[in-house]
Amino acid sequence: MTRVIVVDDSAFFRSSITKMLTQDSEIEVIGVAKDGIEGLEKIKNLKPDVVTMDIEMPKLDGISTLKIIMDEMPLPVIMVSSLTKEGAEATLKALEFGAVDFIPKYPGNSLASMDLAALSSDLCTKVKAVAARAKRFPLKRIRKDKVPIISPVKKDFFTSPNHSERSRRDIIAIGVSTGGPPAVQKVLSELPETFPACILIAQHMPAAFTKPFAERLNSMCKISVKEAEHGNPIKNGIAYVCPGGRHLRLDLKGALPQISVVSEPSTALYKPSANVLMESVGKSMGGRSVGVIMTGMGSDGVEGMRVLKSKGGFVIAQSEASCVVYGMPKAIVDGGLADEVVDLDNIAERVASALYK
């Protein structure tokens, strides 16, 4: 049984989230709280496996509460966020401070304003997945004043004797879901502005979140990071984030690769889809590509990666121990597709090395 505490200042959302969670017989809501102070007291006394946390609350807001949890009694926290630019920015900050994931809070105080069945299934799956992961790999304390340690790929890596010639590969495709934003931030922030490849990212995320995500990455990285637009050219030292609710493809216009932002296939389980991205990169770039699958639930990316690998692409999967949820990378490893399985701390360096393989 997975034990959960729900923290939200809205009685409606406390009730709604509790109803969603208790649809699953393997989840028990052991307490609710209307603000961060009450939430901290109940967390200390009841010791849940997972907490859902609203961001905007009186007395003590969600991010301040999260910082205390991760400093004093680390456990998986799933943020509940409004679908606004401000909500997106606060959520991305919460993920950086240790939250494992988030679910959107739709406007309106009626169950009709939500796709309750889909939200319930998604939330219950996330709760059980992060609880199971925390039991195998307990979360570490994150001090409130901690500065992230960055081990950048040095500029001279690309001018050393082993890498002085033009790299063989110049397109990096990344597929990622649960736990992705801080993981992607870590990888991209370690790359130099002279990085000799273009990076395409399919991060499972709502449409309201992807532009703030790209802007936040751009402010923290030496390379440029942008939300992708249809027709963007491929350039070294730039990372493109696929807009939420759309797909990112790489297509050849004559001999030149060009980004396509499209709605089809509409039947894809996820939008953005790692499968769509990987398949298009494999077909258009073949041996010039590196595919990277990072933390996330499910198996999105595995079919597209089969195409990429069959066309000569190099495949990297994130290690189980460094994932928030070991689903998407596990599918790559179990499918025999991974050329390397790499801890998060080493992905930037291994991606840089893969350009020359």
Swiss-Prot record:
Role summary: Involved in chemotaxis. Part of a chemotaxis signal transduction system that modulates chemotaxis in response to various stimuli. Catalyzes the demethylation of specific methylglutamate residues introduced into the chemoreceptors (methyl-accepting chemotaxis proteins or MCP) by CheR. Also mediates the irreversible deamidation of specific glutamine residues to glutamic acid.
The name this protein goes by in its record: Protein-glutamate methylesterase/protein-glutamine glutaminase
Q: Where in the cell is it found?
A: Cytoplasm
State the InterPro entries in the record. CheB-like, CheB_C, CheY-like_superfamily, Sig_transdc_resp-reg_Me-estase, Sig_transdc_resp-reg_receiver
The entry's comment on post-translational modification says: Phosphorylated by CheA. Phosphorylation of the N-terminal regulatory domain activates the methylesterase activity.
Corresponding gene?
cheB
- PTM-bearing positions, type 4-aspartylphosphate: D54
Q: Which PANTHER family does this entry report, sorted A to Z?
A: PROTEIN-GLUTAMATE METHYLESTERASE/PROTEIN-GLUTAMINE GLUTAMINASE (PTHR42872), PROTEIN-GLUTAMATE METHYLESTERASE_PROTEIN-GLUTAMINE GLUTAMINASE 1 (PTHR42872:SF3)
Query: Which SMART domains has this protein been placed in?
Result: REC
Q: Which reaction does it catalyse?
A: [protein]-L-glutamate 5-O-methyl ester + H2O = L-glutamyl-[protein] + methanol + H(+); L-glutaminyl-[protein] + H2O = L-glutamyl-[protein] + NH4(+)
- Kindly identify the residues recorded as the active site: S177, H204, D300
Q: What is its EC number?
A: 3.1.1.61, 3.5.1.44
Entry domain remark: Contains a C-terminal catalytic domain, and an N-terminal region which modulates catalytic activity.
What's the family? Belongs to the CheB family.
* CC per GO annotation: cytoplasm
Domain CheB-type methylesterase, which positions?
165-357
Q: Does the keyword Phosphoprotein apply?
A: yes
Residue ranges occupied by any Response regulatory domain in the UniProt entry: 3-120
Q: Which UniProt keywords apply?
A: Chemotaxis, Cytoplasm, Hydrolase, Phosphoprotein
One GO term under biological process is:
chemotaxis
Task: Please state what class of enzyme this protein is.
Answer: hydrolase
- Keyword Ribosomal protein (UniProt): no
GO molecular function terms noted in the UniProt entry: phosphorelay response regulator activity; protein-glutamate methylesterase activity; protein-glutamine glutaminase activity
